[in-house]
Design a protein with these regions (language model features):
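Class II aminoacyl-tRNA synthetase-like tRNA-binding/catalytic domains
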Residues: 1-101, 109-113
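Hydrophobic residues within well-ordered alpha-helices
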Residues: 11, 128-131
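Metal-assisted phosphate- and nucleotidyl-transfer catalytic regions
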Residues: 31, 130-168
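Short, surface-exposed, polar/charged, turn-prone segments marking secondary-structure boundaries
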Residues: 88, 112-117, 137-141
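Non-heme Fe(II) oxygenase catalytic core, chiefly the N-lobe of the double-stranded beta-helix
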Residues: 102, 124, 131-135
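Well-ordered alpha/beta subsegment
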Residues: 115-125
Length: 168
């Protein structure tokens, strides 16, 4: 448990430094019919409840923050090259439960403002390299704290195209 907590803390600190991310608090619920609770797979059914002080208006427990993050970036007037990160606690009652899926989701997430001309494969790869560097730094710091957890990741990330995979 201690290692898990340290990995989470180290990684968010490393990534927020690499990608200029600001930590923001995510909502646990949003108002129904605002469009902020993404319908991830077309059949998501949100957990709903009335809010007494709002004339019993209906709120939904979040199951995705994709749209909310973009709205938050706009509200904060986040310039290109900067972004946000958050912890989302969600309920997904439609989830198929197995050894890696639960109806409860504790998900760390981030979003960054980019310019239209940055929507390129080159920029995506540059961002992936920065994320990978954050993972590598986290792995190395974890090794210092827990020497039994040896670093295993290669020095550099390798990109492969789906066509190359088909030819294998």
């Amino acid at each position: 448990e201690k290692a898990i907590k340290q990995v989470k803390d180290m990684f968010q600190n490393n990534l927020s430094a690499q990608l200029a991310l600001l930590r923001v608090t995510a909502p646990i619920a949003v108002m129904k019919d605002t469009g902020l609770n993404d319908d991830l797979n077309g059949v998501e059914r949100a957990v709903t409840f009335p809010i007494k002080s709002l004339d019993n208006a209906t709120a939904e427990v979040v199951h995705s923050l994709a749209k909310w993050k973009r709205l938050k970036l706009a509200q904060l007037r986040t310039p290109a090259g900067r972004g946000i990160y958050t912890d989302m606690n969600a309920l997904r009652p439609e989830e198929e439960i197995d050894n890696i899926h639960s109806i409860y989701v504790d998900q760390w997430d981030w979003e960054q403002t980019i310019l239209p001309e940055q929507r390129t494969v080159a920029f995506l790869k540059q961002t992936v390299r920065r994320i990978y560097e954050s993972i590598k730094v986290t792995e190395n710091k974890l090794y210092v704290e827990f020497p039994q957890i040896r670093p295993q990741l290669p020095e550099q990330i390798h990109f492969i195209h789906s066509e190359e995979l088909l030819q294998m």
